[in-house]
């Protein structure tokens, strides 16, 4: 797992977390990515809609595990929030950054959720979308069996809903074309 933490440094650098920031992760469920990304003195709001799998014990396990990998205690804190398919239940005008990791393609009500998310970001805040990319159009996700979004489809959905694409980082994992991407958007 030390190697995984080293690989994640590329992602951590892209997110540019800073001490004192307030970050939300929507669709957080097991919270292991958020724990890996936890910079010093960041406040995390961890949100999910499935309270049967979104458990404090899982978060505590992940937080402790990554503290061991980091070689020092976590100084970030977290709050658990249960939302629903149309609303995050997060506080408004609060977040420097919002993450959606490998779950945006699962949203049943994408437009409603993006409208809700726009209210949650502070002025100048960034929304990060981390998704696997299909090798071909119409490909289904290997875990949830839902359609994956192409790079172009993802950007189009966000632009249609009042966001602009700022930047992105591709992950090829020894493939010829990217198989995963983190997109960065801000409100237009």
Listing of model-derived features with the role each one plays in the protein:
Residues 2-21:
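Conserved alpha-helix/loop element of class I SAM-dependent methyltransferases that forms part
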Residues 184-188:
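C-terminal lobe and adjacent flexible extensions of AdoMet/dcAdoMet transferase-like proteins
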Residues 111-126:
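A short glycine-rich, Lys/Arg-flanked "PGG" loop and its adjoining helix->strand segment in the class I
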Residues 22, 43, 124-126:
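Short glycine-centered segments of the SAM/dcSAM-binding site in methyltransferase folds
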Residues 24-88:
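Class I SAM-dependent methyltransferase SAM/SAH-binding core
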